[in-house]
Amino acid sequence: MKRLLLTSALPYANGHIHIGHLVEYTQTDIFARYWRMTGRRCISLCADDTHGTAIMIRARQEGRSEADVIADMSAAHQRDFAAFQIRFDHYGSTNSPANRALCEEIWASLRERGMVTTKEVTQLFDPQEGMFLADRFVKGTCPKCAAPDQYGDSCDRCGSTYAATDLVEPRSALTGARPEVRSAQHLMVAIEPERPFLSTWTQGEGRMPKEIANYLAGHFLSEPLRDWDVSRPAPYFGFEIPDAPGNYWYVWFDAPIGYMAASKEWCDREGEAFDDWWRSEETEIVHVIGKDIVYFHTLFWPAMLKSARFSLPSRVQVHGFLTVNGEKMSKSKGTFVLASTYLKHLDPAYLRYYYASKLSSKVDDIDLNLEELVNKVNAELVNKVVNLASRSSRFVAQTGLSAVYPEDGGLFASAAEEGDAIGAAYAAFDYARATRSIVALADRANEYVDRMQPWALAKQPEKKAELQAVCTVALNLFRQIVLYLAPVLPKLADDVARLLGCPMDRWALAKTPLVGTPVAAYEHLMKRVEPGAVEKMIAEGRPAEEAAAPGGAAGANAEAGQAAGGGAAAEDDGAALAKEPLAPECTIDDFSKVDLRVARIVAAEHVPEAKKLLKLTVSLGGEARRTVFAGIKAYYKPEDLIGRLVIVCANLAPRKMKFGLSEGMVLAAGDETVHLLSPDSGAKPGMRVH
């Protein structure tokens, strides 16, 4: 079997790890642990992404060097990963000599192949700081909807995207100075010549989720690829480009090369040959990333690797975003939970198991429903899995397991055979299928214990041998289940290894029963989740003023009103009404025919055949789903709509369109721009608007 080199996207060294990040790192860790259990050679690598303007500015503000800032953040990141049992074979930094050397090697290859060009780029310049401003360091008034205090790349209110130079009354977020428009020479990499190759490579069988491959084909590879801007002028924290003094590689150039640098450092430490991992057909390279960085990893990155004659990724596994209780993570609601905050209140095993139960090979978003987290862990892990050991191990603590495996009606053999399918699910990144199968095995094992009643046998001395046999079967079924869960719950596997006095680190162990061995005194393997602990975690995540405010619902409504109505006095000038006068009067009977409902957007995607439309899937509560085509493509990104509550006309007659059936209408306001209408906090999908 080929060697496996596995990577996760590199966390940026300007912020702490939160529960959204942990979706990906948990997904990667489970994959690595499964393959290690099968005996396959696997290295899992990561590093901190350390370059860019944000790091430089933070260091200035804190009066420290960039090196100190990134060193502290690296230590914090690695501490959080270790606490969540996420194991990397090596954890590096993009600000390393190994990364610089590899950047220079790949850059030389790009130069040699004539892929590097120059272009005059116009940007905003802060005269006080003496530096060009990245989009997120410029604020001003949105040129589309006139919303104040918006960033230089997109508007939080109307969702429009634009160039920073289009902002009305722009100002530097660093100094408040009015920026100047200046030009600078930027270095570009032309990847258009690689478009035929990329069109074929992205469609490779198993290369990436099919929906991602189709998205790339329809949105990027169907027309000429733009040159990629890979440089930034000084001042900038990063690697200076050797043949372009005063210019630095942009963070998205050197960040993916960080995968290779981490590999090089690991190889040097372990005495391995770097080319065996990055220039060998005997190595499979798998990247695990979020859907927001697909472009870099599936177009620009493979083109770079090909230019320098390195191996290309065998697979790019893409996951969706995380919502909490159906909504975007929110600091004001306490659902923007840092890893360190979570650890104060809950066991990391809970989150690892919950994420595993939701992750599949598809690019679906994951909702962390906190009530479901409590119920799932308590019902499945504690009541079904761990309870197997607590119900049986104490009866054989003195005698140990039977010397010969007893007759069990085929339960052990069936579970051993099921291990092949569970392993295949892990290998396909379909952890949800794997955990469903494991819970089904736990159900069968508990049915056996319920039927055999070891607690009743323990009261009959003459049935001591039968009691030992029953507990031997129960504990062997339990051991199989925990072996299958070991990639998800490594600490539980370690604890069970101590309880049963046996190794729990090889997948094949589930094929052979454990007999004639002692059993240690039972100790609690996992505690139930207390809802109060979840509530305390959320309370800690809220800003102090939010947590202390009386009348939580009123406070939330006031916040929502302020966000929606900022600058209202300046906009209530009657212009909108004059432009689109009121419609003719209708009766209450006419109006009552229109059924307006609250709905939640659960999926959103581009419609390749339509310039203005997004395809939305909305939930009206429960299993009720509608497909709606909405003309909002110019104003909203699909990924920003997931989880949002909107108002829909639910009884509008379906309309057949060439790209599908539209089963309703989403309500929005506006003339030249579009603003989706959302209900106040407290509204739930399915509620009627009266």
Swiss-Prot record:
Its cofactor is Zn(2+). The keyword ATP-binding applies. It catalyses: tRNA(Met) + L-methionine + ATP = L-methionyl-tRNA(Met) + AMP + diphosphate. GO terms for biological process: methionyl-tRNA aminoacylation. Zn(2+) binds at residues 142, 145, 155, 158. Is required not only for elongation of protein synthesis but also for the initiation of all mRNA translation through initiator tRNA(fMet) aminoacylation. Homodimer. This is Methionine--tRNA ligase 1. It comes from Sorangium cellulosum (strain So ce56). The lineage of its organism: Bacteria, Pseudomonadati, Myxococcota, Polyangia, Polyangiales.
